[in-house]
Amino acid sequence: MEREKFGSRLGFILISAGCAIGIGNVWRFPYVAGNNGGGIFVLLYMLFLLMFGIPVLSMELAMGRASKSSIIRAYHELERPGQKWHIHGYLGMIGNYILLFFYTTVSGWMLGYFIKYVTGDITKNTDSSQMFADVIANPWIMFVWMAVIVLIAVIVCSMGLQNGVEKITKYMMLILLGLIIILAIHSLTLDGAGKGMKYFLVPDMNKIEEVGFGNIIIEAMRQAFFTLSVGMGSMMIFGSYIGKERALVGEGIQITLLDTFVAIMSGVIIFPACMSYNIPTDSGPSLIFVTLPKVFEHMSGGRFWGAMFFLFMTFAALSTVIAVLENII
């Protein structure tokens, strides 16, 4: 039986970018950039993407294309007799499972918050800190939303590569990109936009001296590897679905550009909004589920913008869940 292939180059790029684009682009990259010298961090990050990220990504795609398999079988297919490279395949698959456990849970939170904004459960008088604490304290609510995400991902993957994974992820990613552009434009119209963009992108020499240039280099390198989801072999499965007529380095560059665009736009959304309402930025879950709801409380049409933001986040997380699940199965 002939192995399925992507129906279009756009489908391949969008689903591969969907695997790379995730919550780390939103709740980690802007905060780390702002706290590590702003523009200097962004420049170093892009340099390391060029030096290490794109070559490693291209290598994973090449291994997938050469073996026509996902990570475990790929190493068995490509290694020479007596070699032990397949051990990394098993370690990589364990990493994919851990990533899936994490993402299905957090994706459920995103979906739950989107529905809360749509139904009006979140208002200007809502205590965002207490609301998030209540969500964490209720395992049944978390289980229900996680189960919904898992069910959606399983249904999409069961529909096959072209009719399921490629088709649905392509629409999700196009909507995601549209949403992030709309949200970024809105943030740039706020009063604190200039101050926020300066904090995010202009090199801060005082911050560089405070943090240390060596530490900034390490953080930029860490983010470059983290953002592309390389190292666990999650990109191999997508390489296995493309033909030899594709230039893998070129495809890797396209994927990296999309991932970087979302990371930069996330900073454009977050910093102007936080600076406009004098709300300190944070990282991790507290940024998404505590800090930003406070921003939306102060914002005109906050319920609408909150719903749009959490729809964007749900698509970003769900695209990764679908991609990782496709790699596992």
Locations of the language-model features?
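Membrane-embedded translocation segments of transport machinery
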Residues: 2-6, 166, 170-318, 322
